[in-house]
C-alpha cells in the first residue's frame, strides 16, 4: 500500500511513509468535528486521511489510536463516508495549503466514525452513525488504559460491524451493528475509508488555538479482489 493510494482533506497531510507500515499523526485545530445535528448544522471539517474506493470492494479497516485526550469532545479514530455529488474531490482538497483554516467544504451524505472521545472528564469509546442525522453511542474505558485503543470496522454482507479493544486487552469486542450502511444501492457508490482527528472545543485561555495531535498505528485495510 503506497502513499499514492491516499488522499487528505480539511488540512490533513498524507503521511510521507506508508501508513500501513509506519505510525503517523494528524493534528486537529480547534472547532473541528464530524457531526450532523440537523439539516442546517452539518459539520465535516475534521482533518482526514483516507482512500477512495468502490463501496463494493470494502471489507474492513482497523487502526490503533492514541492521544493525550483532555478537552471536552477531543476525538480521533476511523471514519468511512459516502461522498455526495456536491462533495469536493479528494484531489482538489489534497492540494490545499496545510495551514489553511478549515471551514466546512466537505459534506458526505452518510458516514460512520468510531474512536476515542473525551466526554465529561473521561475518555470513552465512541461510535457515531449518520444516515440522516447523527446518533452517538458510548462505552466506558478503564482509567488504567484510557488513552489508547484499537478499532475495526468490518463489512458483513450489507451490514457494518464495529469492534474495539482498549490497550491492554487482547480480544476485540463487538460494539455496534449498523444495518443501513450498504443498503439502497450504495454498493455502486464511492466510499472514503480512513482516519480522522477532531477538536470541537478549544482550550481555555491563551491555549485556545492549540490543536490535538492524534497518533495512528498498525493501519490495515482489506479489500475484495
Task: Give, region by region, the residue ranges found by the protein language model.
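Extracellular glycan-recognition regions
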Residues: 1-225
Amino acid at each position: 500500500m503506497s502513499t499514492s493510494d491516499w488522499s487528505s482533506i480539511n488540512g490533513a497531510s498524507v503521511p510521507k511513509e506508508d501508513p500501513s507500515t509506519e505510525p503517523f499523526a494528524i493534528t486537529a485545530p480547534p472547532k473541528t468535528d464530524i457531526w450532523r445535528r440537523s439539516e442546517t448544522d452539518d459539520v465535516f471539517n475534521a482533518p482526514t486521511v483516507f482512500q477512495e474506493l468502490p463501496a463494493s470492494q470494502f471489507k474492513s479497516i482497523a487502526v490503533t489510536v492514541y492521544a493525550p485526550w483532555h478537552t471536552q469532545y477531543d476525538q480521533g479514530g476511523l471514519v468511512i463516508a459516502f461522498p455526495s455529488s456536491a462533495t469536493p474531490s479528494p484531489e482538489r482538497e489534497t492540494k490545499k495549503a496545510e495551514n489553511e483554516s478549515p471551514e466546512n467544504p466537505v459534506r458526505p451524505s452518510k458516514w460512520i466514525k468510531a474512536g476515542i472521545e473525551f466526554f465529561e472528564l473521561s475518555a470513552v469509546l465512541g461510535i457515531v452513525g449518520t444516515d440522516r442525522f447523527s446518533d452517538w453511542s458510548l462505552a466506558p474505558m478503564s482509567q488504567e488504559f484510557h488513552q489508547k485503543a484499537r478499532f475495526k470496522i468490518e463489512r458483513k454482507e450489507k451490514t457494518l460491524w464495529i469492534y474495539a479493544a482498549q490497550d491492554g486487552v487482547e480480544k476485540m469486542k463487538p460494539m455496534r451493528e449498523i444495518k443501513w450502511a450498504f443498503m439502497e444501492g450504495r454498493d455502486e457508490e464511492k466510499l472514503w475509508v480512513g482516519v480522522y482527528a477532531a477538536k470541537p472545543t478549544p482550550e481555555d485561555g491563551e491555549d485556545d488555538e492549540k490543536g490535538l495531535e492524534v497518533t495512528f498505528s498498525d493501519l490495515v485495510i482489506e479489500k475484495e479482489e
